[in-house]
């Protein structure tokens, strides 16, 4: 066999190494060359085949390419629009959800328009100066911006009734704040009182100035809490309704336990939107910030699975990223006098149709790059629109039932908690989470399903 034949023979027999013109190329180089040689239509088709569609009726997933090949899908006689006879309450519920889903876009657009209008500069320049120096989202001062009035707006009742979102209390949780003893001792109802004697009479006149709030003064006597919310779903819709608003009557079910929902710091980079979140008690999920909030006797809620769990979200699934998430347990040990409370939201993953990417697809790489660069990512999803039921970013009307479990108390403060201590409390946490899941799964439509820990 001559030298040219030997080269051709080696190209055919060796799948990993080929010799041509005296140079060696790895299997990865060959793969890249093949990728470049594919036509755009082939790449598009492979990407479609790598996407799996998860929705009602397709809980096990279906390749998107096969779904698009179905003749009924692309030849629907008409778009399924909302009926004009829809009750006005349902319309208001849809608008409340549309506001929440797109609120960051609306406020970002308002900011750009206000900056472009010279008439608004008298407002925008002082605000932007304040925006640049204010560190409230990261220094624990969200407790000063926490507005019970804003959290209690009727808007949030409409938001929660849309799905609906329901909170289920399965155990009594001692309140953090109880009525102060000063209330029983006839504490002054006014900030300033002036007593003037009407001489020469023995009578006097009392002038009361600046009446105090009618709210009963309270003091911190009980433990604080770290609520762990599972699963994340696409956007943790249930966590927002239950923990960031009074739409589910949080203060009635759990009186004396003010709670701050924690999210990524990126959301506080949009002017006005950051102040909107802070007034709802939403703050950043950094360790330093969480410790400061807990030090002020406020409880916190953490969506434990985070962005990584969002990528695994499927309709009707119970896939959790939890085994390797121990930071919230360590946070409880370092604080002391804290209860760790598992919460499971049945139906959180059912509100959107999901397009899940394959590990080797370009779309998956784009999602992971976005997560590495910006700290978060979201799956590809769709549901319905404001005026139609076929396509849009408004979630479906699917019930979300949030079961709040029993607290796992950490009485002692650990200066430097060991791995064994963290694992011990995490095990207790997982056991309680599994208990409430198995006890209530049949009641809320998860019969026959098991918790699946993907990480």
Give the residues covered by each predicted segment.
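Short, conserved catalytic or adaptor-binding loops enriched in Gly and charged residues
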Residues: 156-162, 250-254, 395
């Amino acid at each position: 066999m001559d030298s040219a034949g030997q080269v051709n023979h080696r190209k055919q027999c060796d799948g990993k190494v080929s010799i041509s013109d005296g140079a060696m190329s790895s299997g990865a180089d060959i793969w890249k060359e093949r990728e470049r040689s594919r036509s755009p239509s082939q790449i598009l088709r492979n990407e479609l085949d790598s996407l799996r569609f998860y929705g009602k009726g397709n809980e096990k997933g279906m390749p998107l390419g096969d779904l698009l090949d179905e003749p009924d899908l692309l030849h629907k006689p008409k778009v399924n629009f909302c009926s004009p006879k829809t009750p006005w309450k349902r319309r208001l519920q849809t608008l409340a959800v549309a506001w929440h889903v797109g609120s960051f876009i609306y406020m970002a657009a308002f900011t750009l328009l206000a900056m472009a209008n010279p008439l608004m500069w008298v407002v925008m320049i002082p605000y932007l100066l304040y925006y640049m120096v204010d560190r409230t989202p990261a220094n624990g001062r969200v407790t000063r911006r926490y507005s019970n009035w804003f959290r209690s707006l009727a808007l949030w009742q409409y938001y929660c009734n849309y799905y609906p979102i329901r909170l289920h209390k399965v155990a009594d949780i001692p309140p953090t704040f109880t009525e102060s003893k000063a209330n029983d001792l006839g504490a002054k109802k006014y900030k300033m009182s002036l007593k003037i004697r009407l001489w020469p009479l023995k009578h006097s006149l009392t002038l009361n100035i600046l009446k105090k709030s009618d709210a009963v003064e309270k003091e911190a006597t009980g433990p604080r809490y770290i609520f762990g919310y599972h699963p994340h779903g696409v956007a943790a819709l249930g966590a927002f309704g239950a923990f960031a608003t009074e739409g589910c009557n949080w203060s009635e079910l759990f009186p004396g336990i003010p709670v701050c929902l924690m999210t990524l710091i990126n959301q506080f980079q949009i002017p006005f939107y950051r102040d909107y979140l802070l007034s709802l008690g939403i703050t950043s999920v950094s360790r330093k910030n969480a410790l400061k909030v807990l030090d002020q006797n406020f409880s916190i809620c953490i969506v434990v699975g985070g962005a990584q769990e969002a990528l695994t979200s499927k309709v009707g699934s119970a896939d959790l990223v939890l085994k390797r998430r121990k930071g919230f347990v360590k946070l409880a040990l370092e604080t002391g006098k804290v209860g760790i409370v598992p919460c499971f939201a049945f139906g959180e993953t059912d509100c959107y149709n999901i397009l899940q990417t394959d590990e080797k697809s370009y779309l998956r790489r784009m999602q992971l790059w976005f997560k590495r660069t910006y700290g978060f990512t979201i799956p590809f999803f769709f549901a319905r629109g404001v005026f139609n039921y076929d396509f849009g970013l408004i979630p479906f009307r699917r019930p979300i039932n949030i079961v709040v479990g029993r607290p796992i108390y950490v009485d002692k403060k650990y200066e430097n908690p060991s791995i064994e201590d963290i694992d011990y409390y995490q095990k207790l946490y997982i056991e309680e989470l599994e208990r409430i899941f198995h006890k209530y799964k049949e009641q809320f439509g998860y019969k026959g399903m098991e918790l699946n820990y993907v990480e």
